[in-house]
């Protein structure tokens, strides 16, 4: 199997954060699960795509003005396909995910009393042995740069769709809220992206 990489600047954006850190508080009640959000047809289509795709984004790491890494490309190498890549290899994925975004927006807007704007779609695979340390989606959460923007300052509210759950491990862990759970296949999850919700 030959894998292809498409150069992508998925962290370049003119859009900054629209909510300050802490805007949503730190309550566990701000972490939302929507079971069976994805249809069986969406699940099957996206699972088949993610299982068979061999073309992934190619990005480079980025540091802030203090030399702190705000995006580590090594973590995501050969396992993320974002808008630019999806447009080239299978635009139908974009359509399917956009319909899911549209349905989720209604729930997010209602829950947080906001007018959320979706970022572009991304398909992420987690091969055996991969993991990610607790982090905030929109900002750095530790060290001298804690609270400063990372490469995605516009990730005010994070949302994740889980295509499958037939694997060991993979728990979603929120250390500050003291909760850990295994995400369910076809479920959607959303929560604030600031350092009060490292995961």
Regions picked out by a protein language model, each given a short descriptive name:
Residues 94-199:
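Catalytic core of non-heme Fe(II) oxygenases with the double-stranded beta-helix
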Residues 2-111:
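Non-heme Fe(II)/2-oxoglutarate
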């Amino acid at each position: 199997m030959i894998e292809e990489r498409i150069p992508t600047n998925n962290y370049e954006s003119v859009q900054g954060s629209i909510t300050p850190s802490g805007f949503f508080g730190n309550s566990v009640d701000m972490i939302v699960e929507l079971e069976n959000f994805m249809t069986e047809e969406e699940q099957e289509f996206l699972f088949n795509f993610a299982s068979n795709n061999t073309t992934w984004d190619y990005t480079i790491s980025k540091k802030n003005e203090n030399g702190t890494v705000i995006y580590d490309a090594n973590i995501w190498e050969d396992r993320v396909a974002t808008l630019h890549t999806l447009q080239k290899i299978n635009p139908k994925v974009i359509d399917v995910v956009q319909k899911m975004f549209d349905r989720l927006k209604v729930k997010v807007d209602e829950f947080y009393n906001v007018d959320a704007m979706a970022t572009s779609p991304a398909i992420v695979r987690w091969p055996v042995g991969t993991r990610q340390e607790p982090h905030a989606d929109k900002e750095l959460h530790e060290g001298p740069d804690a609270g400063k923007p990372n490469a995605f300052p516009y990730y005010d509210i994070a949302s994740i769709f889980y295509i499958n759950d037939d694997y060991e491990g993979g728990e979603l862990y929120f250390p500050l809220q003291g909760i850990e759970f295994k995400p369910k296949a076809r479920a959607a999850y959303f929560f604030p992206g600031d350092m009060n919700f490292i995961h």
